[in-house]
């Protein structure tokens, strides 16, 4: 484990950009967990530290859809119009194409520029788009899918999460609506910065507020759970869910494998291969979110806040890496400028920059995966 701790130290401040890092990996029974750093105000990270899962929420979305398939509530080959008239401009798009990112969607007004949930819902229901033979990674399909769940089942996405995951597995730190008043358990993502067109912006990230701006508006500040982001959880709870998913307790292994297969094994974008609302192994060794040695039925979900979750269904193993790569960091740079050793120089001052964090994280991911299959 010494090598893993060394690699974690390379990712965390002062060597790297992360303020804290939690790592857990294993199979159905045994697991190994390591922690490093603080979540804010000097509080050390531990197994119940709560992270903003960001886009990892999409994998929960895909699992809920597979559960609805198992319960004969939905057929993924059906178009949207089979279940609702709300999304009139994309009524003929099939659910499976939304899940596999085989759509190109756009609203007239940005969702994060809407002034209320009501306005955002109007924009989302008026969304325009069409089928795309090549998958295009985007939040928009997940936003539509998240709202569609109610039309299909009569139950909101957030209620599905509570009933399918939180309640049955007694998850104390998997939350979307009732975030604890004791903020000392929740990661602080404050002082995040974006460098856009030569202007340095300081992002407003209140503790316990979802980082994704679309989810903030559409979810009405955690009153509703959106399909693209909004879940918070800990490494302890994700470890429980990893084991439950791999042993077929939440959905069958066949259904989990269907998430990996997605829209077909040839369904590849410009730089990635996709399952249903997740990544799978790709031929591009630099861009792939799944280790090259992983099985065909391995899926990964990644969150902008610094999160990574791998499930290898065939090899019966998982990797969870929960990091905070936003606090006190420049997280977006456009246009690109020189980044040396996770630092950028702007206006005569040096800043931590997490733009290349994923490539550094992948070295840790691959090392752990090699240990798992030894």
Name each region found by the language model.
Residues 149, 245, 313, 322-325:
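Short beta-strand segments enriched in hydrophobic/aromatic residues
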Residues 22, 97-99, 309-310, 318-321:
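Structural recognition of the beta-strand scaffold that forms the well-ordered cores
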Residues 298-299, 305-318:
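Short, surface-exposed beta-strand/loop micro-motifs that present aromatic residues
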Residues 2-51, 73, 330-340:
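Short, conserved catalytic-motif segment at the N-terminal edge
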Residues 13-22, 42-98, 128-140, 226-229:
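Short active-site loop at a secondary-structure junction
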Residues 247, 260-264, 268, 283, ...:
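Short, gly/Ser/Thr-rich active-site loops of penicillin-recognizing serine hydrolases
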Residues 91-294:
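Short, surface-exposed loop or secondary-structure junction motifs
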Residues 9-13, 50, 220, 293-299, ...:
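Short, P/G- and charge-enriched loop/turn segments at secondary-structure junctions
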């Amino acid at each position: 484990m010494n090598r893993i701790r060394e690699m974690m130290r390379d990712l965390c401040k002062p060597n790297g950009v992360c303020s804290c890092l939690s790592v857990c990996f294993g199979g159905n029974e045994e697991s190994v967990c390591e922690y490093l750093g603080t979540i804010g105000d000097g509080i050390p990270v531990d197994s119940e530290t709560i992270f903003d899962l960001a886009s990892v929420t999409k994998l929960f979305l895909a699992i809920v859809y597979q559960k609805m398939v198992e319960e004969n509530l939905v057929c993924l080959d059906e178009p949207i119009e089979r279940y609702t008239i709300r999304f009139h401009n994309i009524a003929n798009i099939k659910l499976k194409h939304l899940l596999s990112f085989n759509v190109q969607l756009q609203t007239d007004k940005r969702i994060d520029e809407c002034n209320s949930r009501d306005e955002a819902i109007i924009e989302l229901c008026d969304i325009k788009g069409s089928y795309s033979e090549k998958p295009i990674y985007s939040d928009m399909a997940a936003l539509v899918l998240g709202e569609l769940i109610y039309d299909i089942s009569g139950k909101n996405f957030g209620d599905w999460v509570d009933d399918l995951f939180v309640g049955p597995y007694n998850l104390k730190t998997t939350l979307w609506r009732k975030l604890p008043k004791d903020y000392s358990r929740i990661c602080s993502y404050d002082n995040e910065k974006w460098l856009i067109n030569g202007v340095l912006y300081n992002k407003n990230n209140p503790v316990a507020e979802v980082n994704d701006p679309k989810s903030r508006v559409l979810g009405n500040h955690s009153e509703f759970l959106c399909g693209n982001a909004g879940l918070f959880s800990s490494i302890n709870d994700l470890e429980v869910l990893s084991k439950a998913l791999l042993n077929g307790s939440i959905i069958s292994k066949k259904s989990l494998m269907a998430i990996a297969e997605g829209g077909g094994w040839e369904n590849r974008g410009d730089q990635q291969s996709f399952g249903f609302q997740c990544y799978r192994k790709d031929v591009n060794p630099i861009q792939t979110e799944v280790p090259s040695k992983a099985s065909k039925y391995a899926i990964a979900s990644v969150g902008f806040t610094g999160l990574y979750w791998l499930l290898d269904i065939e090899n019966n193993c998982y990797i969870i890496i929960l990091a905070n790569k936003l606090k006190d960091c420049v997280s977006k740079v456009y246009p690109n400028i020189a980044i040396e050793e996770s630092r950028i120089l702007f206006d005569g001052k040096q800043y931590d920059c997490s733009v290349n964090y994923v490539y550094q994280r992948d070295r840790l991911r691959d090392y752990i995966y090699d240990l798992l299959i030894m």
